[in-house]
Amino acid sequence: MGCCSSASSAAQSSKREWKPLEDRSCTDIPWLLLFILFCIGMGFICGFSIATGAAARLVSGYDSYGNICGQKNTKLEAIPNSGMDHTQRKYVFFLDPCNLDLINRKIKSVALCVAACPRQELKTLSDVQKFAEINGSALCSYNLKPSEYTTSPKSSVLCPKLPVPASAPIPFFHRCAPVNISCYAKFAEALITFVSDNSVLHRLISGVMTSKEIILGLCLLSLVLSMILMVIIRYISRVLVWILTILVILGSLGGTGVLWWLYAKQRRSPKETVTPEQLQIAEDNLRALLIYAISATVFTVILFLIMLVMRKRVALTIALFHVAGKVFIHLPLLVFQPFWTFFALVLFWVYWIMTLLFLGTTGSPVQNEQGFVEFKISGPLQYMWWYHVVGLIWISEFILACQQMTVAGAVVTYYFTRDKRNLPFTPILASVNRLIRYHLGTVAKGSFIITLVKIPRMILMYIHSQLKGKENACARCVLKSCICCLWCLEKCLNYLNQNAYTATAINSTNFCTSAKDAFVILVENALRVATINTVGDFMLFLGKVLIVCSTGLAGIMLLNYQQDYTVWVLPLIIVCLFAFLVAHCFLSIYEMVVDVLFLCFAIDTKYNDGSPGREFYMDKVLMEFVENSRKAMKEAGKGGVADSRELKPMASGASSA
């Protein structure tokens, strides 16, 4: 199982004949068994938390005395107000829902079980008393009768903080949540440390709420633009590079110009007739416009410099995009692969979060310093948290690796099928079938290696965040260096893993053998890898920039109409981030296809020479691309010792549509 092999095995590997798609065998079975055992452990954690009553406490909620709302409870020893009958009290109500513990990120307000949530704001204790008499829902402590709300001297402690915000029950979780956004703004202050002025945060969140329809529309626009770009890649890949280049130039110039124009316009606008609140909003918008304009200018200059350096290599990318476009023509379901992966990730994340919430309410009841009940796990079971966190990383990486193996298997099937008319009816489903039958162990091993690197990096990032504001600058610098090194190692391993999955899809070898073979082939074709990855990835990056710029420009024009009464700094950031994520999800599949095609090509040229019986599998356009790339690099004096072998044309029947 080790990745290290003897010299004899290495020699045998170098002499081994590659037989694409011919021999299929199970790979890395012990790692599949280990992964299955790990998943059984994850299931045990979920089952344990449900069996110990955590599910009822999570869904129905419980008060500060350990009573579950909506049912009869048993008496807890030495705990006052425990063992109460809450059959008619089905909702959890917090006396002060905005009172947050900023250290432990949890509400430290007293929680009670009530019959109904106050749908309207209650400004006085008389209103609270009237609400209890009309609705039969007592909002003060169990020890205080409704008739004593306005007369008892303990009302200020045992009753909710005034004014009581209007609230509504959270669906399925029976908690009374304030409907006023100001409480959530205060909660966000615990997470957003860079905001020191409460009013700024309130204005930002109000800007998001005011512009929510525009934000939703712009997010849909980014999705439509991404799908349109994928269609363009499929059908007009030959002119796509030039279209992207021109549009990015126009988009970056236009966006930068509009930002400076809006900044100058708003700076000259009269401010004598506006209210103080509108003046503050205008100043926030003016400051944001200046930051955006300067950032856009710097980005545009850097982008132009990069395009100036790479202008001679742009033409070489056209052929590569053309071949990759053919793959999407024959395998149209590849476009939807990110949706299935995202759907699987969302399902797992929902399960993981639900189990995490179960764990947060499981354990034995313990009385804290304030006399209230907390549930804590003691003994070895308290380490289930760590097991659960490792499961989040490993299984998430496993799902992403399954996508890589599925895409690699489908593209490998396309590349090594000489007559494209003989392709399987659904190459994607055929690839999924091979993955499930043969290669789940390889995917489990590759994702585990990424997990081994990601966990230490996350631990170091947490330690680094805890050292912020401390005087030990040397320790922070060392930690930052270690984090950067682990990040680089993780990216390199991700790239190597992807190529290892491709080698496994081609020749059905285990992970270590595939990784070694892929690494050797990539090293032998280092110059070609540099050319293809640099130019191809840069053009895909331009596609992402185009989508973000287009969505951001539309957002600027739409949100500009609301500049007098809302701050659109945060809405614009949300829209641009979502646009980038959507574009990345779509174009990452295209990038993956390009990488798989290149490794297939490198293996093809290494083990075939065009002679009878050893004909090339590759597309003629791909051969022309690499040959032109090699000539261009030789002319630039960067080719080194180039391969002098002439690329021979494909055998009959190898051409693709």
UniProtKB/Swiss-Prot annotation:
InterPro entries reported in the protein's UniProt record: Choline_transptr-like
Keyword tags: Antiport, Cell membrane, Lipoprotein, Membrane, Mitochondrion, Mitochondrion outer membrane, Myristate, Neurodegeneration, Phosphoprotein, Transmembrane, Transmembrane helix, Transport
Major subcellular site: membrane
Provenance organism: Homo sapiens (Human)
PANTHER family: CHOLINE TRANSPORTER-LIKE (SLC FAMILY 44), CHOLINE TRANSPORTER-LIKE PROTEIN 1
UniProt topology in membrane: Multi-pass membrane protein
Protein name, per record: Choline transporter-like protein 1
Residues on Cytoplasmic side: 2-30, 234-238, 310-315, 360-380, 559-566
Top-level taxonomic group: Eukaryota
Gene Ontology BP annotations: choline catabolic process; choline transport; ethanolamine transport; phosphatidylcholine biosynthetic process; transmembrane transport; transport across blood-brain barrier
A molecular function (GO) term: antiporter activity
Medical condition linked: Neurodegeneration, childhood-onset, with ataxia, tremor, optic atrophy, and cognitive decline: An autosomal recessive neurodegenerative disease characterized by progressive ataxia, tremor, cognitive decline, dysphagia, optic atrophy, dysarthria, as well as urinary and bowel incontinence. Brain MRI demonstrates cerebellar atrophy and leukoencephalopathy.
Reactions that this protein is recorded to catalyse: choline(out) + n H(+)(in) = choline(in) + n H(+)(out); ethanolamine(out) + n H(+)(in) = ethanolamine(in) + n H(+)(out)
Basic and acidic residues bias spans: 635-648
Described purpose of this protein according to its UniProt entry: Choline/H+ antiporter. Also acts as a high-affinity ethanolamine/H+ antiporter, regulating the supply of extracellular ethanolamine (Etn) for the CDP-Etn pathway, redistribute intracellular Etn and balance the CDP-Cho and CDP-Etn arms of the Kennedy pathway. Involved in membrane synthesis and myelin production.
Membrane-spanning parts: 31-51, 213-233, 239-259, 289-309, 316-336, 339-359, 381-401, 538-558, 567-587
Modified residues (Phosphoserine): S652
Lipid moiety-binding region (N-myristoyl glycine): G2
Cited Pfam families: Choline_transpo
Mitochondrial intermembrane side: 52-212, 260-288, 337-338, 402-537, 588-653
Tissues expressed in: Expressed in various cells of the hematopoietic system.
Family: Belongs to the CTL (choline transporter-like) family.
Region entry Disordered, spans: 635-657
Variation of activity with pH: Optimum pH is 8.5.
